């Protein structure tokens, strides 16, 4: 199946290449042809300069362009789509893209307005939410729905109108309040780094979430606000809520403040579940820092959560939000996962060149070779020990025997430890 992605050089469109390329024949287009070709080459997919040409050759056409361009691109390419194909968009508003599809696509072309409720930094589809807002369900709908469920995604089906209302809460309201908070901090000339000395776990989580939103493309954030038809009402109610709360405090009306707080709490749903989830997040953050502090002076493996690269070394120190290894590598704690001892060992097996050495040692003939082998295989970083020879004859005194072991290990240090244990058993190295 041929999947075309208009807007495949950036953002979610680029992320979709990663998900699709192993299962489908993928081609992309982009506004910046130089960048588009580079991404296509890096991701090993085809590049097509013309949006309309890509539409004409695709079984499924994915529109992944900025919100403010989505409708115009749909109208541009819609008439060129071939019979039996399907158009999918991935923008975070649905009413206007749906209307454009209904008006510009031929009758024999299906369309499924969608909204993946996750960003381009998401590395796994498992348990991610995707919203479908179909008005018709043709042959393509079941195929798409089944594919998404096969990836363990949470598929929500609703109308475009209801979707946009829910997004006015999930995105418009939350983004507006977060950006307002960040803007207030900027106007107050707050030094965020200085507040870290006083931060509570909840403040820490809040700052990270706010930073995540304000660091997004500001044009994307703006169009999420301005192009959702429910936006004006949402922002008006938010401003009124802020004014009401401020007035209660300024007028020293504690009863009014408590009334507002209690009513707000009652509307927050399952409070115990929210407390449990936030406790888990706080515990996870604290556990990671505790684990790092306990590992100072010891070998550790840190996996970058975005690149997947594993950094191995002795942890020299944890300096604020940075972990520093003895080889000079500096990593932001927020961006790494501490691997377990078992995961570190497996990484070494997969990535370090194994050392092999044949070791001969003379023992009393009363020793039991299998016991020695079992003991040696328990040595740290020893992969395998094989008894290759038992010899009694010339050059070996009576009552003794020579045992030869082939030792496979991850380091020369491990092989030296094996030799030390052999001599500890009373053996004499040959």
Residue ranges and their predicted role:
Residues 53-100:
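Rossmann-fold NAD(P) dinucleotide-binding segment
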Residues 94, 101-160, 164-167:
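Rossmann-fold dinucleotide-binding core
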Residues 163-188, 196-214:
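Active-site-proximal catalytic alpha-helix in oxidoreductases
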């Amino acid at each position: 199946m041929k999947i075309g992605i208009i807007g495949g050089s950036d953002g979610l469109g680029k992320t979709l290449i990663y998900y699709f390329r192993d299962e489908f024949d993928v081609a992309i287009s982009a506004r910046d042809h130089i960048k588009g070709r580079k991404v296509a080459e890096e991701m090993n997919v085809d590049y097509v300069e013309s949006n309309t040409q890509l539409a004409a050759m695709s079984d499924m056409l994915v529109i992944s362009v900025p919100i403010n361009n989505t409708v115009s691109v749909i109208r541009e390419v819609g008439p060129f789509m071939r019979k039996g194909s399907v158009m999918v968009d991935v923008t975070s508003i649905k009413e206007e893209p749906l209307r454009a599809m209904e008006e510009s696509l031929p009758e024999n072309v299906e369309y499924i307005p969608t909204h993946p409720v996750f960003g381009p930094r998401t590395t796994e589809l498992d348990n991610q939410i995707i919203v479908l807002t179909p008005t018709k369900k043709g042959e393509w709908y079941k195929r798409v729905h089944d594919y998404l469920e096969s990836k363990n995604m949470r598929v929500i089906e609703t109308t475009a109108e209801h979707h946009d209302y829910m997004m006015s809460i999930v995105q418009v309201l939350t983004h507006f309040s977060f950006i307002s908070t960040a803007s207030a901090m900027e106007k107050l000339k707050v030094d965020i780094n200085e507040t870290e000395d006083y931060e509570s776990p909840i403040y820490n989580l809040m700052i990270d979430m706010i930073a995540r939103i304000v660091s997004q493309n500001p044009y994307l954030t703006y169009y999420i606000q301005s192009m959702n038809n429910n936006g004006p009402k949402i922002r008006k109610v938010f401003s009124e809520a802020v004014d009401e709360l401020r007035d209660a405090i300024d007028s020293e009306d504690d009863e009014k403040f408590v009334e507002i707080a209690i009513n707000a709490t009652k509307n927050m749903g399952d409070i115990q579940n929210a407390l449990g989830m936030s406790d888990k997040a706080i515990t996870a953050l604290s556990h990671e820092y505790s684990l790092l502090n306990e590992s100072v002076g010891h070998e550790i493996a840190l996996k970058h959560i975005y690149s997947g690269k594993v950094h191995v070394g002795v942890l020299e120190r944890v300096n604020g939000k940075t972990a520093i290894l003895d080889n000079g590598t500096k990593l932001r704690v927020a961006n790494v996962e501490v691997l377990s001892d078992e995961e570190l060992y497996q990484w070494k097996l997969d990535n370090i060149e194994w050392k092999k050495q044949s070791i001969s040692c003379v023992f009393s003939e009363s020793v039991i070779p299998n016991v020695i082998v079992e003991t040696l295989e328990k040595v740290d970083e020893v992969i395998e020990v094989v008894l290759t020879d038992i010899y009694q004859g010339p050059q070996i005194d009576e009552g003794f025997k020579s045992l030869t072991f082939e030792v496979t290990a991850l380091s020369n240090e491990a092989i030296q430890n094996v030799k030390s244990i052999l001599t500890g058993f009373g053996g004499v190295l040959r």
